[in-house]
Amino acid sequence: MENISNLNKIEFISSLNKIRVESSKLLPINNSFIRFDLLNLVMLHELEGEELSFKRLYSSVNHSDIGLRNHLMKLKDDGWISINESKKDARSKIITATDKLHRTYERLSEALRKNS
C-alpha cells in the first residue's frame, strides 16, 4: 500500500467497514470469518456456474474441517445453503445457495451501493 495516498487508504478501509457492517446486518455470520468465507465461496461458485464440493471447499479456505462442517450444517439447517448429491459424481456432495441466500446477497449489494 506504499503507493496509495492516505485518502485512498481511508476510502479503502471505510469500504471494508461498510461491507462488514452491512454483512453483519443481513447475513448470519455472527462475527465469524468462517461463516463469512463460506457464504461468499458458495455464492462465488454458484455465480461462476461451478459446483462446490466438500473437497473443493476444504481446499479453498484456511479453517479447520470440524469448524467448517459445524457451520455448514447450521447454515443448511437455517435454510441458507443446501447440500445435495452431485449430478456428475454420486459420491460427491455439492453445496449450493438457496433462494434465501440469493435474495440476501441482492439486498446486501443494494445496501452497499446506497452507502457508497
Which residues does each PLM region occupy?
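N-terminal leader segment of winged-helix/HTH proteins
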Residues: M1-I29
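A short secondary-structure junction motif
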Residues: L16-R20, H45, D78
